[in-house]
Amino acid sequence: MDDQPASSTPRAGGAAVLSRRGFLLGAGAASLVTGGVTFGLDRRSDAQSRDLEDSADPGGWSRGLGQHRVVWSVPTTLPVVALTFDDGPDPELTPRVLDALATSGARATFNMMGWNAARHPGLVRAVVDAGHELGNHTWTHLDLAGRSASQTRRQLDLGRRMIEAAGGVRPRWFRPPRGNLTGAAVCAAAELGHDVLLWSIARGPAGVGTPAAVANHLSRVVGPGDVIGLHDGIGRGTFDADGSLARHLRARRLVELAALPTALRRLQARGIRLVTASELVDALVPIRA
């Protein structure tokens, strides 16, 4: 994941879903080959906007397009939200995120870079042992926009294999770097057995921001069925880890981390249960043909 502005568009009366053609316009013709289920686009990041043709069906269920899913959020009125972290594992950030989650009792999905998982296998195992879920965030966080099918598949396959080797479990989810979901990525994800996980709410304030601003944003805009996209790493492997971009991203991550305990506490005070992506989707959105 790359930092993107979170949408604060009010929830529509029903959840928006993509028709076959609408998904093809947004993600490419690979969806016809691989199939997928898309749902929950009533609130979404600008980076993940797609051309919508259909409004939600009254029941708010997913639309069946095959055996694989593309998820932004889940249409529900139940106070359940998926918490996700990208770009790790990181020896400075990941343990502190795990501590905050343990204190709050929240569960999360960690979308890891294979490059980082191979270098910090103990952290991958710690995430699994703490009861959290693993996702595949590619091998080196390469932006997949404009990449060939073979380049794309290599990024997904190497990431998956390194994460599975370190954690001992196969990651269910694939989250594309920067939210750039291409036709080749949809194909590769389906071939590797992944569902695709995007996000509907990001950390909020532009720039580095402050812990108070991030916590205030999250506690204000998060609602039932959202997928929150945060970070426990900086995308290392794609740029100079000591360069200005890395320093800027680490400063942002430290602000997110400082905001996390307050944000979790406020969300739980609203009665919101924070769970993994699989817990959210499997409990609330059965596949419908």
Language-model segments: which ranges?
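His/Asp/Glu-enriched short active-site or ligand-binding loop at hydrolase and phosphoryl-transfer sites
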Residues: 180, 186-224, 272-283
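Active-site beta->alpha N-cap acidic-glycine motif
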Residues: 53-136, 140-145, 151, 155-162
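Catalytic grooves of carbohydrate-active enzymes
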Residues: 223-278
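Active-site beta-loop-alpha junctions enriched in small/polar residues
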Residues: 88, 113-115, 139, 177-179, ...
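Structural detector of well-ordered beta-strand residues that form the stable sheet scaffold
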Residues: 109-111, 135, 175, 197, ...
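Histidine/acidic-residue-rich catalytic or RNA/ligand-binding cores of hydrolases
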Residues: 208-212, 238-246, 288
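N-terminal pre-catalytic segment of deacetylase/amide-hydrolase enzymes
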Residues: 2-83, 89-103, 261-289
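Divalent metal-coordination and catalytic microenvironments
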Residues: 86, 101, 134, 174-177, ...
